[in-house]
Amino acid sequence: MSEAGVAPIEDGSQNSSGGSSGDAALKKSKGGAKVVKSRYMQIGRSKVSKNSLANTTVCSGGKVPERGSGGTPTRRSLAPHKAKITAAVPLPALDGSIFTKEDLQSTLLDGHRIARPDLDLSVINDRTLQKITPRPVVTSEQKKPKRDTTPVNLVPEDMVEMIESQTLLLTYLTIKMQKNLFRLEEKAERNLLLVNDQKDQLQETIHMMKRDLTLLQREERLRDLIEKQDEVLTPVVTSKDPFKDNYTTFATALDSTRHQLAIKNIHITGNRHRYLEELQKHLAITKSLLEEIMPSHASENAESFDTIKDLENIVLKTDEELARSFRQILDLSFKVNKEISLQSQKAVEETCESALVRQWYFDGSLP
């Protein structure tokens, strides 16, 4: 690779040297100015030494000797590496627009304007340079995938027909299963709705029965309590009548003794209780006498009572009629007096003068 990369560089260097010598001769003939030869033209003389030095730097893993020591290669020792890169540079890279001001005019000619070499400086950092192995060029024919030339085992037609029939049967069965499943789902939904309705009805009946049961239990408890009260109060019923009589006598005695009588102007001899006892005896005597007198005159008193009642009704009616007639008489007298006063006023106004009438009805200050 190194020899192949150096060979074209050498030819180009010779051509460039020839061209540069011709230019120098023209310049001498024109003006006689001093021409400095380029060091780049000396690459052909030290071909063998440079190749051997490049091989040693690439293959060996040792350090590069320091600059200034004996036998160290100078900047020109990198020419083989530059030659390798320039061999693969395309034609558009030879344009002069890619160079910068840092490029020396003495080292480059018009025919050798190329891009800067990509220098590998791993040797300076004690690293071995690995030789880049070229990759084989892959053509378009090689990129095409290779077809499998193995023979394909063909399936017999009977097997294909059998598989098709089985697939048809399976599809039919799946469709039928789906239809049956859909029908069963609808039936299950209807059954669930019916079950829910029945559940609601049963819950309502259960609530009604629970309420009736609680009412019955409460009635039974009340009945038991009433029976127990009857059992306890039955002996009291026999003593109810004497208790009632005793209670009435006690109430009357309490009423008579609770309120004090107005005895302010009554002379009482002795104790008050003794006076009440004597008074009670006298009242009992008067009661017996009245009972003896009343039966003989009861019929007469009833007849007289009826007549007195009728007379009372007649008196009430006459009283009402008299009150009504009296009101009517008062209204009539009021109207008569009013009419008489109006007539007398009219007669007086007619007989008297207007000035006098004006004084009667109006203030004297008015004109």
Curated annotation (Swiss-Prot):
Write out the coiled-coil annotation as residue ranges.
183-221
What are the annotated GO cellular component locations?
centrosome; cytoplasm; HAUS complex; mitotic spindle microtubule; spindle pole
Keywords from UniProt, A to Z, are: Cell cycle, Cell division, Coiled coil, Cytoplasm, Cytoskeleton, Microtubule, Mitosis
GO BP field? cell division; centrosome cycle; spindle assembly
Source organism, top-level taxon? Eukaryota
Aminoacyl-tRNA synthetase is among the record's keywords:
no
Is Cytoplasm one of the keywords? yes
Primary location class: cytoplasm
> Which portions of the sequence form the region Disordered?
1-35, 54-81
Q: Where in the cell is it found?
A: Cytoplasm; Cytoplasm, Cytoskeleton, Microtubule organizing center, Centrosome; Cytoplasm, Cytoskeleton, Spindle; Cytoplasm, Cytoskeleton, Spindle pole
What is this protein for, i.e. what is its function?
Contributes to mitotic spindle assembly, maintenance of centrosome integrity and completion of cytokinesis as part of the HAUS augmin-like complex.
- Share what the entry says about its subunit structure, partners included: Component of the HAUS augmin-like complex. The complex interacts with the gamma-tubulin ring complex and this interaction is required for spindle assembly. Associates with microtubules. The interaction with microtubules is strong during mitosis, while it is weak or absent during interphase. It is unclear whether this interaction is direct or indirect.
Protein family per UniProt: Belongs to the HAUS8 family.
The molecule here is called HAUS augmin-like complex subunit 8
